[in-house]
Amino acid sequence: MSKLLFSFLLLIIGVSAQFQFFEQMFNNGGQQHHHHQQPQDVPSDSQWYQDNYDRAHCSGYLCPGTLSCVAVPHHCPCAHPVYEEKFELADGNAICISKGGFKAGEAARKVELARKGLI
């Protein structure tokens, strides 16, 4: 029984090696296997941002944080709307603040309290 099992395992290994040979030969067109390169990180300087900023066309206001084109600065969207809430200030500016687990509108209420010096 063990001799039969050993012979069967040798046959399986041999067939597997044959298929790997043919797969490599025909699927790659006889070329050597090319390794996939990992995508490169963006550089640590601001050149990538500056290049995109310089190429952006906007007839209105180009938001510096998102490179969105809007009519006026306080229309700029938050860069991460899932995590940030936009709050428009009385002077026409807007800020994006972390939602931080607060319910909707709570972050804006805290900004208003801080502006009044209450927190």
UniProtKB/Swiss-Prot annotation:
Signal peptide start and end residues: 1-17
Keyword Zinc-finger attributed: no
Classification via InterPro entries: LCL2
Superkingdom assignment: Eukaryota
Keywords, alphabetical: Signal
Transmembrane residue ranges: none
Family: Belongs to the LCL2 family.
Purpose: Probable component of the endoplasmic reticulum-associated degradation (ERAD) pathway.
Protein name stated in the entry: Long chronological lifespan protein 2
